[in-house]
Amino acid sequence: MLTWDQENATTAPMPNNMDAATPHQVPTSASQAAPSASATGATATTTSAYSMSAPSTGRVKASDKRIINGKTDVNQLVPFKYKWAWEKYLASCANHWMPQEVNMTRDIALWKDPNGLTDDERRLVKRNLGFFVTADSLAANNIVLGSYRHITAPECRQFLLRQAFEEAIHTHAYQYIVESLGLDESEIFNAYNEVESIRAKDQFLIPYIEILCDPTFKTGTIETDQALLKSLIVFACLMEGMFFYVGFTQILALGRQNKMTGAAEQYQYILRDESMHCNFGIDVINQIKLENPALWTAEFKDEIRALFLEAVELEYRYAEDTMPRGVLGLNASMFKGYLRYIANRRAQQIGLDPLFASEENPFPWMSEMIDLKKERNFFETRVIEYQTGGALSWD
């Protein structure tokens, strides 16, 4: 089972003696294995992108590739240098799913039943969807309009294309839930303009999309490369790695109580996808640090820590807004410890010290939800290893 301590799913060692899923193989050239935070400190000896002079035409050498500021032909996928990116792409393809294959009949009946859910549970569902229906569109915009054009490793671009498609599937899933339940579409889809706790999170994210989407923005200097790196950290560690987890926990908690099981099943698939996106983003971040150690300055790390602290506060306010009273055996204060736990994990994964005193995961069952590589029946839907190699099976 993929656990929080194995969440990177790479062959790289985890910091602070957190073991990865498999033993680390030391690469023979410029990190062919996925990079770890501990391998990307200021003492890295890999050639900096600023002094790199790789050929721009002709046959590509794997050793000449760079994540950013590369000079090799981005249209030539092989030879691979970053095999971890290709492996994640293949794993994501194997986990393909579509929302309409999930049965929503029980959810519809429960939602229509006046006594099916409490008012607090209904508020939670609507606030939850209010954030997610547009969040994945923001993530997709960040990829297709921003970060994709600044990444110069074609195997990483290949994953980004798959990731953008999955963001579209997630938006489709939330729309499918909204439509199935007969919710007011304009209320839910415009929540990011009308609900302050949702709006605050989105306004935190938007500047990091806009800078990369600016057609005049180009990497190649310390300042612009740090701007790109900061945006990648915000989206991998804070959006996909933190801002989604209150919502995931809430809907999956409903599913654990045999409520809204169709929605919970889709959220479980989305959680699995987003865990892969987060891990890929962290690998890219660490590889950029390895290839460009001059970016990882003390001042820059202080800026990243400040962003982490702000994100924890924003997500905690969202938790308070979605559940002002205790519901489902959860309450907002429980999420304070959870968010600090996640923030510490993300910080360590990119080579920062923990931001908070030792925090434990108050929801260990969430670790089980990340992995679907086995027969499992969490929500009475009898899902059997949903992969394209074996179609979704309903008993």
Q: Which residue ranges define each predicted feature?
A:
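Amphipathic alpha-helical packing elements
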Residues: 50-111
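N-terminal intrinsically disordered, low-complexity tails
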Residues: 1, 5-44
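Non-heme di-metal
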Residues: 119-395
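Asp/Glu-centered strand-loop micro-motifs enriched in Gly/Pro and often flanked by an aromatic residue
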Residues: 55-62, 75-76, 105-134, 146-149
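Membrane-interacting alpha-helical segments
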Residues: 37-57, 121-123
